[in-house]
């Protein structure tokens, strides 16, 4: 599709990397360089494509409710890669889940809001274990 990186086009890679975040400034030059490097590594790209194809072939919707363990979902409220309605669906399907929203956050909450992300994880672990 149109979201697959054009490997040699660094500005395209920058644009797509920025789209992952609510705040495009999180996509630093260093991060864009790393994504560009990954996009130009044939072996890595083939593995990523394999994972993507597997995810498409194996819809987990029927298996997710079988997960009985306590589950902490952390979602960027402005995630455009995996939109918030997917978080709501996962939350409904996971019988022992809690859904935590991080406002002003896109797809990669652990990078965009690492402190808040860590606080949520630590609180979940303290409450559950």
List where the protein language model places each region.
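Catalytic active-site module of serine/aspartate enzymes centered on a nucleophile-bearing elbow/loop
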Residues: 96-129
């Amino acid at each position: 599709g149109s979201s697959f990186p054009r490997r040699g086009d660094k500005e395209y890679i920058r644009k797509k990397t920025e789209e992952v975040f609510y705040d495009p400034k999180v996509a630093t030059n260093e991060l864009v360089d790393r994504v560009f490097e990954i996009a130009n590594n044939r072996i890595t790209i083939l593995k990523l494509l394999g994972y993507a194809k597997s995810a498409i072939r194996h819809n987990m919707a029927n298996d997710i409710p079988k997960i009985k363990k306590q589950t902490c979902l952390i979602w960027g409220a402005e995630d455009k890669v995996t939109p918030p309605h997917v978080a709501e669906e996962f939350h409904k399907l996971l019988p022992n889940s809690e859904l935590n929203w991080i406002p002003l956050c896109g797809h990669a909450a652990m990078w965009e809001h690492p402190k808040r992300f860590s606080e949520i994880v630590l609180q979940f672990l303290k409450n559950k274990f």
